[in-house]
Amino acid sequence: MLPSQSPAIFTVSRLNQTVRLLLEHEMGQVWISGEISNFTQPASGHWYFTLKDDTAQVRCAMFRNSNRRVTFRPQHGQQVLVRANITLYEPRGDYQIIVESMQPAGEGLLQQKYEQLKAKLQAEGLFDQQYKKPLPSPAHCVGVITSKTGAALHDILHVLKRRDPSLPVIIYPAAVQGDDAPGQIVRAIELANQRNECDVLIVGRGGGSLEDLWSFNDERVARAIFTSRIPVVSAVGHETDVTIADFVADLRAPTPSAAAEVVSRNQQELLRQVQSTRQRLEMAMDYYLANRTRRFTQIHHRLQQQHPQLRLARQQTMLERLQKRMSFALENQLKRTGQQQQRLTQRLNQQNPQPKIHRAQTRIQQLEYRLAETLRAQLSATRERFGNAVTHLEAVSPLSTLARGYSVTTATDGNVLKKVKQVKAGEMLTTRLEDGWIESEVKNIQPVKKSRKKVH
C-alpha cells in the first residue's frame, strides 16, 4: 500500500539542479583558505586545481578573465586565500567552487579583513562625499602626524620649506607601524583637535608592505579621521597603496610629498604672481595717467575754442554769410516766380475753353441728327419685316386651314388620325373644326384602294 502523502520524487537532473541552486543562492560568495594541488592550465587559459587541507579537498576552477588579475603564479603546495562562489557541475554531480580572486595566505587574510572593514564603513556612510571638509586656502598652520624618525616627515618638511618657508608646521609624533601604532595615531588626531593650533592635518607614512601599512587600515584610526573637526589629508605609502584612511580622509594624496604640496603655497609662484600683479598695476597706472593727460588736453583745447570773443567772431561771420545767401535766394525766388507766372499765362491762353465748347456743341448736334435718321430707318425696316412675318404666319396657321373647310380628327389617345387602320369600330373620335369640336363613334371602316399610276 502507498502512504496517503507520497514523498517528492526527483529525477537525477532535477536533483542536481536543485542542489546547485541551493548552493549558489544560500551560500553565496565565501572566502576559503587551503593548499593548491593538481594545478593545470590548458590552452583556454583557465586554471583548474584542487584546494585541500589536512582532512578534505575541493575541486576549483578559475576562469581566464579572473586569473588575469592574480599578481603571482600559483604553485603546487602553496597556501592561498581565495574568494569564490560554490556551485555544482550538474552533468557529473561534482561539487566545485568558481574562484573570483586569489592571494597568498598571509596577505590574503589581511586583504579579507580590509575588504570587510571597507564594506562596513562604507555602509555606515563614512566614505560619503557629503562629509568631506574643504581644505583651507591658504593654510595658516599645518599639523603633521607621522613618525618623527621616518622618511615621510623629512619629505614633508623639505617640500614645505621649499614652497612656503613662512608656513608654521606642528609635528604630532606617532608610531606608524606595530601594535601600538593605531592607538598613537588616534591620540595624535585627538590632541591636534583639542589644541586647535592648525587648520589642516597630514596623516601618513612612507611606503611598505600590506602588513607595514596595516595601522592605517585600523577601524579606530578611520573613525578618528572621520570625527576630526580639522580637515585631514591622508598620505600613506606610494600612489598604488590605498588604505581605509584614504577613503575616510577629506583628501587623499598619493605620497607624503604630494600632501605637502597640496596644503602649501608655492613661494616662487606667489612671487611671480606678485611681480606680475605689480607690472599690471604699473601698466594700468601709466595708461590711466596717459588717458587723463589726453583728456585734459582735449578739454583745454575745447575751452580755448569756446572763448566768447572767438565765438562772437565766428557767429558774426556766419551771420554775414547767411545774409548773403538769403539775399541771393530771395532774388532767385522772385525771378523764378515771374518766369513761372509768364508760363502759366501762356498756357491759360492756349487752354481757353470757349472754342472747345463751340466745337463740342456742333459735334453734338450732328450726332443727334444722325442718330434720329438712323432710328427712323431702322424702325421702318423693322415694321416692314414684322408685317411680312405676320402675313406668312397667317398663311401657314392651322386655323387658316380649318377656315378653308378642313378638319383634324384625333383618337382617344390624342394621336391625329392619318389612316383608317389607326381606329377600330366602336371607338370614339374627336374632330376639330374652325369653330369647335365634334365627338363621334366609329360605326364602319371603309378603306380606299389606291389607284395605280400608269407608267408611260
From Swiss-Prot:
EC number from the UniProt entry: 3.1.11.6
Effect in UniProt of substituting residue 188 to T: Cleaves EC83 msDNA normally, reduced toxicity on overexpression
CDD domains assigned: ExoVII_LU_OBF
GO cellular component annotations of the record: cytoplasm; exodeoxyribonuclease VII complex
Main subcellular localisation: cytoplasm
Phenotype of null mutants: No longer processes msDNA correctly (when retron Ec78 or Ec83 are expressed in the strain).
Matching Pfam families: Exonuc_VII_L, tRNA_anti_2
pH-activity profile: Optimum pH is 7.8 to 7.9.
GO molecular function, one term: exodeoxyribonuclease VII activity
GO biological process: DNA catabolic process; mismatch repair
Keywords per UniProt: Cytoplasm, DNA-binding, Exonuclease, Hydrolase, Nuclease
Domain of life: Bacteria
Cofactor binding note from Swiss-Prot or TrEMBL: Does not require a metal cofactor.
Region described as Binds ssDNA, also required to bind the small subunit: spans on this chain: 1-103
Family matches, as InterPro entries: Exonuc_VII_L, Exonuc_VII_lsu_C, OB-fold_nuc-bd_dom
Catalytic activity: Exonucleolytic cleavage in either 5'- to 3'- or 3'- to 5'-direction to yield nucleoside 5'-phosphates
This protein's domain notes: Predicted to have 4 domains. The N-terminus (about residues 1-103) binds ssDNA and is required to bind the small subunit; it probably has an OB-fold. The predicted catalytic domain is residues 104-266. Three alpha-helices are predicted in the C-terminal region (residues 267-301, 307-349 and 353-393), their removal singly or in pairs reduces small subunit-binding; none of the deletions have exonuclease activity. The extreme C-terminus (394-456) is required for exonuclease activity. The N-terminus (residues 1-257) at low levels does not confer processing of msDNA and at higher levels is lethal.
Family from the record: Belongs to the XseA family.
Complexes and interactors: Heterooligomer composed of two different subunits with an approximate ratio of 4:1 for small to large subunit. Also estimated to have a 6:1 ration for small to large subunits.
Descriptive protein name: Exodeoxyribonuclease 7 large subunit
Organism: Escherichia coli (strain K12)
